[in-house]
Amino acid sequence: MISASRAAAARLVGTTASRSPAAARHQDGWNGLSHEAFRFVSRRDYASEAIKGAVVGIDLGTTNSCVAVMEGKQAKVLENAEGARTTPSVVAFTPDGERLVGMPAKRQAVTNPNNTFYATKRLIGRRYDDPEVQKDTKNVPFKIVRASNGDAWVEAHGKLYSPSQIGAFVLMKMKETAENYLGHTAKNAVITVPAYFNDSQRQATKDAGQISGLNVLRVINEPTAAALAYGLDKSEDKVIAVYDLGGGTFDISILEIQKGVFEVKSTNGDTFLGGEDFDQALLRHIVKEFKRETGVDLTKDNMALQRVREAAEKAKCELSSSVQTDINLPYLTMDASGPKHLNMKLTRAQFEGIVTDLIKRTIAPCQKAMQDAEVSKSDIGEVILVGGMTRMPKVQQTVQDLFGRAPSKAVNPDEAVAIGAAIQGGVLAGDVTDVLLLDVTPLSLGIETLGGVFTKLINRNTTIPTKKSQVFSTAADGQTQVEIKVCQGEREMAGDNKLLGQFTLIGIPPAPRGVPQIEVTFDIDANGIVHVSAKDKGTGREQQIVIQSSGGLSKDDIENMVKNAEKYAEEDRRKKERVEAVNMAEGIIHDTETKMEEFKDQLPADECNKLKEEISKMRELLARKDSETGENIRQAASSLQQASLKLFEMAYKKMASEREGSGSSSTGEQKEDQKEEKQ
């Protein structure tokens, strides 16, 4: 344990905190620098000449994900292979081991609920014992299990997957979407995270990017990205609030936009509040009503529950534009008396009553964010809505009541975050030069000191990147080592906050308590990820770590997952090749049989039989297609095609010569007739 009592004395004798220029400006004002000068000084940290190629912006969402790229000065949202601009963040594993991502995974969820993963972003960077995780285990049909490191992972067909891996599979789909559009490999990316994500969750998201094969240049906050999308082409200076209620998380950020500088003043939120909770509340209501009417409890039937879950989500969306909707699920389940059907009418007012407590949970974070930013609602010039749940009229009314103005609909709530990520990618690549983003750390950072007290070194809403040092001392006589426990949160006692990690500084010369001087330095990079060092000022001995939670993924874990992801990518490529080869072969068989019927009178019988044998062999090959390579199938199909082309060429020539013969004979007959007429 180390003592904080020394810190006050140390400060009296001149120990000071070192800060980044951004942090200093945030706390001390502009220090006489113009916006342009400050932008010029700071941009060295934000752009890099080493970045080659396009930087894709990815909104890795709880429910849906979206990808965008910069085209000139404009960001473009890309359509996936299914033609949609957003992709469901759903991953499924079929009984034969095939992995499905996006809409194909979502479509089969009813028949495969135990092995279809959705909303796993809510588990990312979390421990299995977290109350939120324990709550989730009761609400989802798939298995959430404790990993060997204590983190919450998921299980399918006996295999364990980290939430970072599931996120990586979704990111690979987004990467593929970008590559199909760009026509070349997409390597660099900016990925967004909820503003209120802690360090563990940010690190786990970055791990997901690495597993997917992406070079994650920056992790930025979702509300900040949305503000970039909103303010890129705006010239006026103003303070804006970004209210982001998505599929799994809620964030509120207050920003000041001034001459291309986007400065986050404060942020707050709830990382376990979103559309999934609205769906779950409605699902519970439907299940309760169904049991009251039929006496059947649906909670034991995962397949029926998945149907109800999808119907609840659909009804929720419909009630944003309609005042009433019907929920009809025929043959939902069965008991001794026969099949049971679900038929229910749901009004908007009923739904609002069911979820009113969830909407109210967004109010306190908004009030706290305004308080931290030292602004009143009259100071806020615009309120931007982000996230699918902000389409709900009751949510919009709550926002209007809270901020005293109708919210703006200037951005697409589903696409704004990806657009902002692409813009930040353009800034990092040097393609966008008139924008500077100054974000903040959402939670206070510090260490545990004597008595279990949480001593803050960096307060929440400090502009990042930032660096701060403070001197501590030993708590006992003769102490030769100190354990540094790094925590994140706002509670007074360290045990009530999130333990990010811990390390030990050893080799301190024995001395009376309070004599050794141990300098602890916190450094938060532009991704919001924490680096901590502890140095014995007497010996110069230093210990440094990039904070990883006591769980988290080790370097070896990530490398193994990268290899597995590459293996999956290779399997996907082989599968695609095989499917294309099978389609080609079936097309050639069909064309060959059609032509054989068409030219049957011109084809020699023995040649015709040979061709039929070739077709039979091809069909036998297709019958075992799952064990054949695409190349083998393609070669066999090409061989059949060549054989059929030669035969049909012979038949065509024979038919042509027969036509010529019949044509010349008819011409001769005509000439004879003409001679007879003349005579």
From Swiss-Prot:
Annotated EC: 3.6.4.10
Function: Mitochondrial chaperone that plays a key role in mitochondrial protein import, folding, and assembly. Plays an essential role in the protein quality control system, the correct folding of proteins, the re-folding of misfolded proteins, and the targeting of proteins for subsequent degradation. These processes are achieved through cycles of ATP binding, ATP hydrolysis, and ADP release, mediated by co-chaperones. In mitochondria, it associates with the TIM (translocase of the inner membrane) protein complex to assist in the import and folding of mitochondrial proteins.
NCBIfam families, per the entry: PRK00290.1, PRK05183.1, prok_dnaK
HAMAP family assigned to the protein according to its UniProt record, in alphabetical order: DnaK
Transit peptide feature range: 1-46
Region (Nucleotide-binding domain (NBD)): 63-431
Region (Interaction with NFS1) residue spans: 1-432
Swiss-Prot/TrEMBL domain comment: The N-terminal nucleotide binding domain (NBD) is responsible for binding and hydrolyzing ATP. The C-terminal substrate-binding domain (SBD) binds to the client/substrate proteins. The two domains are allosterically coupled so that, when ATP is bound to the NBD, the SBD binds relatively weakly to clients. When ADP is bound in the NBD, a conformational change enhances the affinity of the SBD for client proteins.
Catalytic activity: ATP + H2O = ADP + phosphate + H(+)
Protein name according to UniProt: Stress-70 protein, mitochondrial
Gene Ontology biological process terms in this record: calcium import into the mitochondrion; cellular response to interleukin-1; chaperone cofactor-dependent protein refolding; erythrocyte differentiation; iron-sulfur cluster assembly; negative regulation of erythrocyte differentiation; negative regulation of hematopoietic stem cell differentiation; negative regulation of hemopoiesis
Annotated segments matching region Interaction with FXN and ISCU: 432-679
Residue ranges, annotated region (Disordered): 655-679
Regulation: The chaperone activity is regulated by ATP-induced allosteric coupling of the nucleotide-binding (NBD) and substrate-binding (SBD) domains. ATP binding in the nucleotide-binding pocket (NBP) leads to a conformational change in the NBD, which is transferred through the interdomain linker (IDL) to the substrate-binding domain (SBD). This elicits a reduced substrate affinity and a faster substrate exchange rate. Upon hydrolysis of ATP to ADP, the protein undergoes a conformational change that increases its affinity for substrate proteins.
Phosphothreonine carried by residues: T87
List of residues that carry N6-malonyllysine: K206
Residue numbers bearing the N6-succinyllysine modification: K135, K138, K206, K300, K360, K368, K394, K567, K600, K610, K646
Keyword Nucleus (UniProt): yes
UniProt-listed InterPro entries: ATPase_NBD (IPR043129), Chaperone_DnaK (IPR012725), Heat_shock_70_CS (IPR018181), HSP70_C_sf (IPR029048), HSP70_peptide-bd_sf (IPR029047), Hsp_70_fam (IPR013126)
Pfam families: HSP70
Quaternary assembly: Interacts strongly with the intermediate form of FXN and weakly with its mature form. Interacts with HSCB. Associates with the mitochondrial contact site and cristae organizing system (MICOS) complex, composed of at least MICOS10/MIC10, CHCHD3/MIC19, CHCHD6/MIC25, APOOL/MIC27, IMMT/MIC60, APOO/MIC23/MIC26 and QIL1/MIC13. This complex was also known under the names MINOS or MitOS complex. The MICOS complex associates with mitochondrial outer membrane proteins SAMM50, MTX1, MTX2 and DNAJC11, mitochondrial inner membrane protein TMEM11 and with HSPA9.
GO molecular function: ATP binding; ATP hydrolysis activity; ATP-dependent protein folding chaperone; enzyme binding; fibroblast growth factor binding; heat shock protein binding; protein folding chaperone; protein-folding chaperone binding
GO CC annotation terms, alphabetical: cytoplasm; mitochondrial matrix; mitochondrial nucleoid; mitochondrion; nucleolus
